[in-house]
């Protein structure tokens, strides 16, 4: 840390990228047996924000808050954007499977700025949840993985990686 005499504050000499989390959430449809993924439709940017993939389907996720661990951020974003609550902080239990998938940091993966994301994947009993879009998600919906089209950002890559891991685990 270095002291900045102009601002009167201690500052890091290192540049810091924006940090986000994204979640690839899978569930089986009991009626047709298909593997489905939870997607959100990105809403319009708020006034003053740079638009990024408005109207595109994406994985639920978003920016980390100050002093927030990534494990908490992914749960908060899932709840804010889809109403899915996988973790109950009051009881300290985690009833569903969720695990880190990979960290993504390619230049240009987000048109707004340099963003590093910690991606997670989860397996849930989807009938336990009533899904609805919230926060900056215009809509939330379960979509069969074989019907997913182009996704925002590099979310198609994340979905593909999570599917590969699941396929390897069940073979």
Model-derived features: where do they sit?
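N-terminal strand-loop-strand
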Residues: 2-59, 71
